[in-house]
């Protein structure tokens, strides 16, 4: 299957999170983690939590990834902390995409689900990259 020139998220508002003051953020913030190290190194686990919650909302069979489904900051921070246990940065963060994919698969497995995250291999040299139109999903 070839990707079209237009790729988008079907329901971006489903990633909105309401803060304690009623303000809405589009996605999560690693600064919500309770621990300073998590705040500094938590970009990967934060992104993983957003992805996993979106999958839980958009695919009923993946609802166990975030069964609460609550999109308030306190509840979502709880999800971020649970995801951290599987998508855990090392001293240099998540410096390989495989670390994030493996951690997300581990999080799903702990909930009785099989999740097979795909990785898009992109050569570092621009001249070796395929044209966008030839990239397959």
Predicted features and spans:
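Active-site-adjacent structural segments surrounding the nucleophilic cysteine of cysteine proteases
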Residues: 1-106
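Mid-length scaffold segments of soluble, non-membrane domains
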Residues: 103-110, 115-117
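Acidic carboxylate-rich catalytic motifs and surrounding loops in phosphoryl-/glycosyl-chemistry enzymes
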Residues: 115-126
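Active-site-adjacent substructure of cysteine-protease-like catalytic cores
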Residues: 125-137
């Amino acid at each position: 299957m070839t990707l079209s020139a237009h790729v988008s998220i079907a329901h971006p508002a489903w990633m909105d999170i309401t803060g304690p003051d009623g303000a809405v953020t589009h996605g999560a913030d690693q600064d919500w983690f309770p621990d300073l190290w998590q705040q500094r190194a938590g970009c990967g686990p934060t992104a993983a939590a957003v992805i996993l919650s979106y999958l839980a909302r958009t695919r009923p069979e993946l609802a166990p990834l975030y069964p609460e489904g609550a999109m308030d900051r306190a509840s979502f921070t709880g999800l971020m902390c649970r995801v951290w246990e599987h998508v855990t940065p090392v001293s240099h963060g998540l410096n390989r995409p495989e670390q994030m994919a493996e951690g997300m698969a581990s999080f799903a497995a702990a909930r009785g689900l099989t999740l097979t995250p795909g990785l898009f291999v992109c050569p570092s040299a621009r001249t070796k990259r395929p044209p966008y139109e030839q990239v397959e999903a």
